[in-house]
């Protein structure tokens, strides 16, 4: 998460600018809640949040699911379930949290302000490369800005990665996701329990879990596409197009009369990078690698990045280049493992 980078590196007296695709027009802007935006925080992510002293607020704003329940998409027939509340806490020492993304952003933004970190949004920052300079500079609002360290967190479509890390190529987009949040009011009983539900289908699957916000349930539908998928950040589609794409069970389809806006997202993948560092620039989060989201590790991966980066800088405070190279080596190894498991999960979830 961009905001976690700000907080952690600020504590190490870092000088940092974060090029970002996010825009905060108003703290009270609730537009984000119209989209499916649930996230899952596992033990590693919660560890970082504890170090930021915000874990308590995150836990209070989310829920700790009791079970992982498996279903056949056809007829919503139960396959089995696994207790995860106590199992995960016993194994990893921390609980598994499901919550709304906007709530986590709000908590981190409040922490940034409390620590008096200066942050500026609505500013496009692009890389400025010159052959005779050892470091990359920032071009922003017509000005050249020099910084010791630039942390790039501008997402799967990272402009910085395209310019500076040209060797990292995108994989062909073959899958897409539909996301939205529904009130549990008119949903079947299987969605009303405090569980993560995983529904298997042929070449597709969907996941649901509570977000802790006014009884809202997060729905994420993923499927393999037969044809070309537009390489856009998101695309607004009609409810009928979504229903036609998924051919949902009639029981579930009848639960969607209140759905007015559905967004279709291309699942953008990139090749495993050899390095996520060049000169004074490092990639974090989805900017480092776009991968199949079949481990629900997007937020955790970004939180891990911020923690590892800060610790590497702390270890080598007088040798930034060495610190960044160590960060890159550690994170690339981790990304390789996450990508491998995510691709395996795709085969399992899609019954292949």
Language-model segments: residues:
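Conserved N-terminal helical subregion
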Residues: 2, 42-183, 226-239
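Conserved mid-domain beta->alpha element of the FAD-binding
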Residues: 9-10, 26-27, 151-152, 208, ...
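Acidic/histidine metal-binding catalytic segments
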Residues: 60-61, 246-261, 320-325, 338
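Histidine-centered metal-chelating micro-motifs
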Residues: 157-158, 177-179, 204-207, 288-289
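A short coil-to-beta-strand element that immediately follows conserved catalytic motifs
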Residues: 171-175, 191-195, 237-240, 248-266
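Short helix-loop capping/hinge motifs at secondary-structure junctions, enriched
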Residues: 184-191, 214, 227-228, 274, ...
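Active-site substrate-recognition segment that forms the wall
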Residues: 194-229, 246
């Amino acid at each position: 998460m961009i905001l976690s980078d700000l907080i952690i590196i600020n504590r190490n007296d870092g000088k940092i600018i974060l090029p970002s695709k996010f825009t905060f027009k108003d703290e009270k802007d609730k537009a984000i809640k119209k989209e499916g935006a649930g996230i899952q925080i596992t033990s590693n992510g919660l560890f970082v949040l504890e170090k930021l002293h915000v874990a308590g607020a995150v836990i209070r704003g989310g829920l700790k699911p009791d079970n992982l329940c498996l279903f056949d998409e056809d007829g919503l027939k139960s396959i089995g379930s696994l207790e995860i509340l106590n199992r995960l806490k016993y194994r990893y020492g921390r609980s598994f949290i499901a919550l709304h993304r906007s709530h986590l952003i709000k908590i981190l933004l409040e922490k940034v302000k409390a620590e008096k970190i200066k942050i500026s949004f609505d500013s496009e920052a692009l890389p400025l490369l010159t052959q005779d300079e050892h470091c990359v500079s920032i071009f922003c609002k017509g000005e050249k800005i020099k910084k010791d360290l630039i942390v790039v967190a501008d997402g799967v479509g990272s402009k910085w990665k395209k310019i500076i890390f040209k060797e990292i190529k995108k994989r062909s987009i073959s899958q897409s996701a539909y996301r939205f949040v529904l009130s549990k009011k008119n949903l079947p009983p299987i969605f009303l329990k405090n569980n993560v539900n995983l529904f298997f289908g042929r070449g597709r699957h969907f996941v649901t879990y509570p977000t802790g916000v006014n009884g809202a349930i997060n729905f994420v539908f993923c499927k393999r596409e037969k044809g070309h998928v537009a390489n856009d950040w998101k695309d607004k589609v009609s409810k009928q197009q979504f229903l036609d794409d998924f051919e949902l069970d009639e029981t579930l389809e009848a639960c969607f009369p209140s759905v007015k806006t559905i967004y279709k997202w291309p699942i953008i993948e990139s090749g495993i990078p050899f390095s996520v560092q060049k000169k004074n620039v490092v990639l974090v989060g989805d900017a480092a690698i776009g991968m199949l989201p079949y481990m629900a590790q997007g937020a955790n991966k970004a939180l891990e990045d911020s923690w590892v980066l800060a610790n590497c800088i702390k270890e080598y405070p007088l040798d930034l280049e060495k610190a960044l190279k160590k960060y890159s080596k550690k994170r690339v190894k981790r990304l390789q493992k996450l990508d491998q498991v995510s691709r395996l999960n795709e085969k399992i979830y899609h019954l292949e």
